Curated annotation (Swiss-Prot):
Role of this protein: Catalyzes the pyruvoyl-dependent decarboxylation of aspartate to produce beta-alanine.
Cofactor(s) the record lists: pyruvate
UniProt keyword annotation of Lyase present: yes
Annotated keywords: Autocatalytic cleavage, Cytoplasm, Decarboxylase, Lyase, Pantothenate biosynthesis, Pyruvate, Schiff base, Zymogen
Active site: S25, Y58
Protein's UniProt name: Aspartate 1-decarboxylase
Keyword Cytoplasm: yes
Length: 125
């Protein structure tokens, strides 16, 4: 049986832009994409800490420090909002004991503070 498991997240990123007239997506600093092993056009869930909005979109590479919501998503976040960007993967149950997500922690300028591979939580059955 496969389970949907957190694959990677960028924790408490600060929204730097909202472009309603762009064709959808979220622009993310390429350094953050690399740290979390995100790929262009990957589906991500966005959790807005400021207002509780939760929605899905896809990733495109952005400029250094950039976290910009594009298209319809621009209505759900404002510059200055704090968000969590999460990606999930289907993992076979027998692989869960070895699976570890990428956890990317950033400061208020979206600079990487730390990247962790979660070893604290172990799957037990």
């Amino acid at each position: 049986m496969k389970r949907h498991i957190l694959r990677a997240k960028i924790h408490r990123a600060t929204v730097t832009g909202a472009n309603l007239n762009y064709e959808g997506s979220i622009s993310i600093d390429e350094r953050l994409l690399e740290a979390g092993k995100f790929v262009v056009f990957e589906k991500v869930d966005i959790y807005n800490v400021n207002n509780g909005n939760r929605f899905s979109t896809y990733v495109i590479p952005g400029k250094p420090g950039e976290i910009s919501l594009n298209g319809a998503a621009a209505r759900l976040c404002m510059p200055g909002d704090i968000i969590i960007i999460a990606s999930y993967a289907e993992v076979e149950e027998e692989e869960l004991h070895h699976f570890r997500p990428y956890l990317v922690y950033v400061d208020d300028k979206n600079n990487i503070l730390e990247v962790k591979r979660d070893m604290e939580h172990v799957f037990t059955f």
